[in-house]
């Protein structure tokens, strides 16, 4: 039985609107890919502040969105929404949306095939900002400034990658994981997404680690969207007390805790993990 996928964008967002326009030109407003029935949905508000009522009856939500901020270079990014700590930009305090690890990974893999040719980078982002939704959600983005948000080549590359990702996305294809540590865009986690068998859903950056107690760890795992038995830790990207608390909570839940550099060494032959 096919599943319903909402491809949502805000009319206030030039990047999301541009991605949607490119998809509409290629596929129309409603279309089927593989076992997914897809529908483009425009919302009036900024996506960060919606409550999700627009998506009743859908099984999944992919948000076509702009990326803002770091690294001050054209980039394609993916992440799930939610707040490990206080909600500064939409959503609820200490609540995470349900993730779609495999779709996020497939988007990054697909867009990486197009990025270098047009001068873009690719980056995996941690869980951050609103909304906090009870529908499996993935933000698929282009950034990080007004120029990139309106760049026709970038928007076309993003749109093509969204469609390719939906086509490739299959349950159980990858090993779902949660991740902890490091900067906002963690090159190590990005390489895990692009080149290994693991698909990361929720990830807490070093900046949010102080909020990650046992309950937040449990929530990250339970709302990761796919059965999750692995946690990837950026050992040097966490304070000692935060790392001990988080790893203890993960082990209490029965998860296998793996250092990110071990994954890169074992699967890619990297000693330290190269930057991309």
Curated annotation (Swiss-Prot):
Its name, as the record gives it, is D-aminoacyl-tRNA deacylase
Q: Which PANTHER family match?
A: D-AMINOACYL-TRNA DEACYLASE
Q: Supply the InterPro entries for this chain.
A: Deacylase_DtdA_archaea, DtdA
So which cofactors does this thing need? Zn(2+)
Q: Which organism is it from?
A: Korarchaeum cryptofilum (strain OPF8)
Q: Name one GO molecular function term.
A: zinc ion binding
Give the cofactor note text: Binds 2 Zn(2+) ions per subunit.
User: Which gene is the coding source of this polypeptide chain?
Assistant: dtdA
Enzyme Commission no: 3.1.1.96
User: What's a Pfam family in this record?
Assistant: tRNA_deacylase
- Keyword terms, alphabetized: Hydrolase, Metal-binding, Zinc
Report the record's Gene Ontology biological process terms. D-amino acid catabolic process
Q: What does this protein do?
A: D-aminoacyl-tRNA deacylase with broad substrate specificity. By recycling D-aminoacyl-tRNA to D-amino acids and free tRNA molecules, this enzyme counteracts the toxicity associated with the formation of D-aminoacyl-tRNA entities in vivo.
Q: Which family does it belong to?
A: Belongs to the DtdA deacylase family.
Task: Classify the source by domain of life.
Answer: Archaea
């Amino acid at each position: 039985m096919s599943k319903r996928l909402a491809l949502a964008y805000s009319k206030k967002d030039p990047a999301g609107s541009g991605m949607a326009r490119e998809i509409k030109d290629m596929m129309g407003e409603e279309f089927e890919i593989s076992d997914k029935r897809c529908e483009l949905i425009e919302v009036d508000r900024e996506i960060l502040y919606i409550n999700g009522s627009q998506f009743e009856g859908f099984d999944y939500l992919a948000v076509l969105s702009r990326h803002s901020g770091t690294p001050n270079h054209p980039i394609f990014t993916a992440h799930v929404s939610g707040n490990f700590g206080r909600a500064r930009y939409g959503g609820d305090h200490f609540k995470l949306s349900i993730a779609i690890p495999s779709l996020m990974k497939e988007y990054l893999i697909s867009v990486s095939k197009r990025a270098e040719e047009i001068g873009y980078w690719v980056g995996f982002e941690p869980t951050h900002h609103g909304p906090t939704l009870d529908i499996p959600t993935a933000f698929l983005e282009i950034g990080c400034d007004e120029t990139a948000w309106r760049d026709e080549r970038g928007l076309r590359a993003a749109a093509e990658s969204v469609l390719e990702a939906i086509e490739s996305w299959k349950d159980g294809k990858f090993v779902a994981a949660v991740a902890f540590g490091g900067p906002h865009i963690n090159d190590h986690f990005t390489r895990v997404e692009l080149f290994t068998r693991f698909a990361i859903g929720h990830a807490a950056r070093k900046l949010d680690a102080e909020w990650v107690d046992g309950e937040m760890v449990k929530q990250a795992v339970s709302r990761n969207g796919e059965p999750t038995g692995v946690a990837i830790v950026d050992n040097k990207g966490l304070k000692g007390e935060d790392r001990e608390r988080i790893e203890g909570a993960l082990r209490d839940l029965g998860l296998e805790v793996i250092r990110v550099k071990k994954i890169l060494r074992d699967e890619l032959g990297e000693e330290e993990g190269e930057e991309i």
